[in-house]
């Protein structure tokens, strides 16, 4: 049985539960008044940083089951974020069966999903962000960051080429963002979206290839998009490396770090042939030092798509950064990691995925330096937040768009447009019931998820193959046992701009080499060499592996 709003407040212990605050409310927080301002967080510092990441196109509320396995190796073994289930609850001091336990772990997922409902939704996120800004004394005292992997991951984001998410983020009031899957549209499409975005799109670790700079074609393309994509020709930078923001009267430098392995993980030649990506630790240190010496900021923070292990290592080696706000690895970590380095301590956070959380960090800045902080990660429990009316209206109107011949779903001309969908609205297509499931379908897990099993089994059947492989990505929503599976659910697990499937013959030695190569990228002890994500999914063949 699901909880009533009154029951929910009782479970929260009148505001005592970590990460969710229930209070008496204020006239300025009318939208949250009906649920007693459970998300109103009193300001404890003088600059508030708000953080979302890896929403993967999920404008609507959804279910997302957290992993039951998240292996760490060497120095990361048994350390955050490689702690799950009851062990994580113990570390963060959360009671089993509570709303936070539902949000942060896989424990009793089906029962707690029935009890607490869906999570996320941009209408709900907008409402909570506005409340957090108001409780900080106004938007001028806050800064809203997006860690990327936002413009991809749903049917509507695919069909609009990410434009639906850009507009939604503008409505959220996102000030700064970085990218990864944002680059898996054609370069011109990415630059068009960057121009449409009202905030700052950063990337200190992205470069323009020399061949592109030597010719005229790239420069001509950037001119069409108001110079976006050619921030500094001398430094071969397509995007700003950092921006200075005034937050509560304090100058905060925000550095952007795109996913460093984008060129390895995604098809560079087709989507972004003129750009290169890298970790660029030395350049990061040089940039931080330069900012500290010449800009004289009160704080330096990084909005990062490195992945949490990489952020932790970088924080231990680069001096002068106050905090990392991370993404990529979808680690919903309510407890920050404090990392010691030669210059002091850097705080590392990661705000999960699918619109499930908002990270809130209040910085205390005294005499032009950070002297302390408080951090909360708020789970967005859909049923207990009144959605923002303007956002709901935008989403509804966008979903009422009709699928037409201009929609591009794939690289292949033969598959780029689906004739069966022509003339139907996006909502009509996505709300189609496909089947029901008697077991929970989920994506997260180091070696397999039930959604992945459905996908690889389907590939085997469709192509009459002996076995099938599918990438171990971490994006994709869940469907609890007993629920209907809709086209929306399927699209949130398959929507990418290069989703074509292929059939080929492999010898055993070739297959073994492929699996070992993937495992090496995932489980190597040095975080700088890890690609993130999970092991390739297999159907029709079993294997044994010793990741250590």
What name fits each language-model region?
Residues 1-3, 7:
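Secretory targeting signals
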């Amino acid at each position: 049985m699901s909880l009533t709003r009154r029951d929910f407040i009782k479970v929260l212990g009148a505001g005592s539960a970590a990460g969710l605050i229930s209070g008496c409310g204020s006239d300025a927080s009318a939208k949250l008044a009906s649920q007693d301002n459970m998300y109103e967080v009193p300001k404890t510092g003088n600059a508030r940083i708000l953080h979302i990441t890896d929403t993967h196109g999920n404008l609507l509320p959804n279910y997302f089951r957290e992993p039951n396995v998240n292996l760490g190796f060497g120095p990361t073994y048994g350390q955050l974020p490689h702690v799950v289930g009851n062990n994580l609850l113990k570390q963060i001091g959360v009671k089993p069966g509570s709303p936070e336990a539902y949000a942060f772990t896989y424990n009793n997922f089906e029962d707690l999903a029935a009890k607490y409902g869906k999570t996320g939704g941009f209408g709900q996120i907008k409402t909570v962000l506005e409340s957090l800004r108001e409780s900080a004394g106004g938007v001028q005292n806050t800064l809203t960051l997006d860690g990327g992997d936002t413009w991809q991951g749903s049917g509507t984001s695919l069909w609009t080429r990410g434009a639906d998410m850009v507009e939604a983020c503008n409505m959220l009031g996102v000030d700064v963002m970085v990218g990864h899957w944002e680059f898996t549209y054609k370069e011109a499409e990415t630059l068009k979206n960057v121009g449409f975005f009202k905030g700052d799109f950063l990337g200190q670790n992205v470069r323009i290839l020399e061949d592109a700079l030597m010719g005229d074609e790239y420069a001509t393309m950037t001119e069409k998009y108001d110079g976006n994509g050619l921030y500094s020709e001398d430094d071969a930078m397509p995007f700003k490396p950092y921006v200075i923001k005034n937050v509560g009267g304090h100058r905060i430098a925000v550095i952007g770090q795109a996913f460093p392995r984008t060129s390895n993980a995604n098809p560079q030649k087709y989507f972004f042939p003129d750009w290169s990506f890298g970790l660029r630790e030395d350049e990061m240190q040089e940039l931080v030092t330069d900012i500290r010496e010449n800009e004289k900021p009160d704080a330096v923070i990084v909005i990062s798509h490195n992945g949490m292990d990489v952020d932790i290592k970088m924080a231990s080696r680069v001096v002068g950064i106050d905090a990392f706000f991370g993404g990529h690895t979808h680690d919903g970590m309510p407890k920050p990691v404090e990392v010691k380095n030669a210059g002091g301590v850097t705080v590392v956070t990661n705000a999960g995925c699918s619109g499930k959380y908002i990270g809130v960090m209040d910085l205390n800045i005294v005499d032009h330096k950070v002297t302390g902080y408080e951090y909360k990660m708020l789970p967005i429990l859909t049923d207990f937040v009144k959605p923002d009316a303007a956002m709901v209206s935008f989403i509804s109107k966008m979903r009422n768009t009709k699928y037409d011949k201009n929609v591009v779903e794939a690289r292949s001309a033969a598959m780029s447009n689906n004739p069966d969908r022509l003339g139907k609205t996006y909502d009509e297509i996505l709300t189609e019931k496909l089947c029901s499931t008697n077991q929970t379908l989920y994506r997260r897990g180091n070696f397999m998820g039930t959604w992945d099993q459905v996908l690889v089994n389907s590939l085997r059947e469709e192509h009459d193959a002996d076995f099938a492989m599918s990438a171990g990505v971490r994006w994709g929503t869940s469907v609890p046992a007993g629920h209907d599976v809709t086209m929306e659910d399927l699209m949130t697990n398959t929507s990418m701009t290069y989703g074509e499937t292929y059939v080929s013959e492999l010898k055993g030695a070739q297959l073994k080499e492929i699996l070992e190569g993937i495992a090496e990228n995932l489980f190597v002890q040095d975080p700088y060499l890890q690609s993130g994500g999970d092991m390739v999914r297999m159907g029709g063949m079993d294997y044994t592996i010793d990741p250590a």
